[in-house]
Amino acid sequence: MNAIGRILLIAAYAVLGLAATGRSVVQITTKLADAPLPYLVSGASALLYVLIAVALWRGWRRVAIVGTAVELVGVLVVGTLGYAAPELWPDETVWTGYGSAYGWVPLALPVIALVVLLRGGRRAPDDAVSAPTA
């Protein structure tokens, strides 16, 4: 992964982590009894975003890949359940509506991150550059 791509992913996950953390802290501390499932999902998503940001920053590629895969599954499951069983989601989470309240960034970001992370792992090592042979 190139430096600019890495910095952009770290920044995106850090900002989303801060936003989700702020939202979930308010939800959990003020009205957890009203909608425990959505608010706990918000808290889990916040922790996941922070973990992914740290993993990208520290170069923990496998942790970042697993984290973004879990994120994508979470967005798809919560987004689908929000439409199929709206009674489970009396209030919004970061992932409700496939992240529509956040401009669908929660849906697009893990796809982009997985493409970048998985493509970066398939590059040939520098010492494998083919040299002309005699």
Model-predicted segments: where are they?
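Cytosolic juxtamembrane helix and N-cap/initiation of the first transmembrane helix
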Residues: M1-L16
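Transmembrane alpha-helix entry/boundary detector in multi-pass membrane proteins
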Residues: G5-L9, V25-S45
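C-terminal TM-helix exit segments that contain a strictly Trp-centered aromatic cap at the helix terminus
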Residues: A20-Q27, V70-P86
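Alpha-helical transmembrane segments in multipass membrane proteins, preferentially the mid-helix core
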Residues: L48-R58, A113-V116
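Loop-to-transmembrane helix junctions at the membrane interface
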Residues: A55-V75
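Membrane-helix boundary connector in multi-pass membrane proteins
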Residues: T80-G99
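Individual transmembrane alpha-helices with interfacial aromatic-anchor signatures
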Residues: T93-I112
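Membrane-interface capping segments at transmembrane-helix boundaries
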Residues: L117-A131
